[in-house]
């Protein structure tokens, strides 16, 4: 069990200090995305390291994907809105993430992985959050799990908003 799983739930609210606009960039083999949380903000937002949003109807913006690259000491959580992305890593994990699905990867002591589109046309859209691991967990064994949309608990608020719970509990749904 990771130390983060033992942490008490957040008990107090914080005020918004500033609104920060994302900026257009590319990563991997040229995937166009919007970077919302950046290295400049990492110390202020730990454990949140980075948040990228990607989305395009033009396959040229995403088709090359994210070829083999290393990670260590943090987790990535990817949520797909549209499209299909294949994950493979050096620890032997593999999976395909489809619309509404979530992929959770703990890099721990280190992993080399790739994320390559499983499509050649159509919309590809989603976002990826990077979470810093506590110091005690930075050298843990790499771990991977993907969840299809049908496996994730969801509900609608009284106002009609759709909520999908990808971690923890929301309104007694977990």
How should these model regions be labeled?
Residues 128-135, 148, 165-169:
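Short, structured patches in soluble enzyme cores that scaffold and shape functional sites
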Residues 139-145, 173-174:
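A short secondary-structure junction signal
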């Amino acid at each position: 069990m990771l130390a983060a799983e033992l942490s008490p739930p957040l008990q107090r609210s914080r005020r918004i200090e500033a609104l920060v606009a994302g900026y257009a960039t590319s990563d991997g083999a040229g995937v166009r995305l919007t970077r919302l949380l950046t290295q400049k903000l990492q110390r202020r937002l730990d454990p949140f390291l980075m948040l990228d949003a990607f989305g395009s109807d033009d396959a040229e913006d995403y088709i090359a994907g994210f070829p083999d690259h290393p990670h260590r000491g943090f987790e990535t959580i990817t949520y797909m809105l549209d499209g299909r992305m294949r994950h493979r890593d050096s620890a032997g994990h593999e999976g395909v993430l489809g619309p509404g699905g979530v992929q959770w990867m703990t890099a721990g002591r280190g992993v080399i992985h790739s994320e390559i589109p499983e499509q050649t046309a159509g919309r590809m859209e989603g976002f990826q959050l990077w979470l810093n691991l506590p110091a005690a967990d930075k050298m843990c064994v790499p771990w991977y799990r993907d969840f299809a949309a049908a496996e994730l608990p969801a509900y609608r608020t009284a106002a009609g908003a759709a909520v999908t719970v990808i971690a923890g509990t929301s309104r007694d749904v977990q």
